[in-house]
Regions:
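A generic local structural motif
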Residues: 24-26, 63-65, 111
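C-terminal/domain-edge helix-coil "capping" segments
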Residues: 17-28, 115-174
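Positively charged n-region of N-terminal signal peptides that target proteins for export
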Residues: 1-5
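C-terminal motif of bacterial Sec signal peptides marking the signal peptidase cleavage site
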Residues: 12-15
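Surface-exposed short loop/turn segments
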Residues: 66, 80-134, 142
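N-terminal segment of the mature soluble domain
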Residues: 36-87
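Immediate post-signal peptide segment of exported/extracytoplasmic ligand-binding proteins
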Residues: 30-36
Length: 174
């Protein structure tokens, strides 16, 4: 029992900070032909300036590690769109009382929501072929958001989003 409690606590904390990602891409594209990228000049990410800089630093680092380089005349344009919204509370506690007599039964149950609704952030990453002006790859992430998080925590959260989103980029050709 002593080892089960710490393991359960770690799993609970890990599940709270998970990043979910959905992908879509053009199966006819050979992604190995792309080597350069840049951001849309008029990109409106929806993030604060500080968070946008954190996200772009993480993205630059990830793309560089995969052999892509930032260029004035890129082959790919990156567009980022973000949205923050309040999610529904998903934790409830049921409290019930009941009694039974010889031939009489009864009960009462009440559901109590725990905590308030939680904030979520969705970030959509679009990769557009610059020459054809065509969307070729898209990923949308969803993760928890804490407004009162420290700058280092915010940076780590955004790094984790980029890591998870680009873990399957470029797509494997079958």
């Amino acid at each position: 029992m002593r080892t089960v409690l710490p393991i359960m606590l770690v799993l609970l904390l890990a599940s709270c900070s998970s990043v979910r990602v959905n992908y879509d891409y053009d199966k006819t594209i050979d992604f190995s032909g792309y080597t350069t990228y840049n951001y849309y000049p008029d990109m409106k990410s929806g993030l604060s300036q500080l968070d946008e800089r954190r996200l772009l630093r993480a993205l630059d680092s990830t793309l560089k590690s995969r052999g892509y380089r930032l260029a004035e005349e890129p082959e790919l344009f990156v567009n980022i769109i973000s949205d923050e919204y309040r999610g529904a509370p998903n934790n409830n506690v049921g409290v019930g009382i009941g009694g039974t007599g010889r031939n009489v039964g009864g009960g009462i149950s009440v559901g109590l929501p725990l905590g308030g609704s939680n904030w979520k952030r969705s970030i959509q990453f679009d990769l557009v072929d610059a020459q054809r002006d065509a969307l070729i790859w898209q990923a949308t992430s969803e993760s928890g958001l804490r407004d009162n998080a420290s700058p280092s925590v915010r940076e780590e959260q955004l790094r984790e989003v980029v890591k998870k989103v680009f873990s399957k980029f470029p797509p494997k050709v079958k």
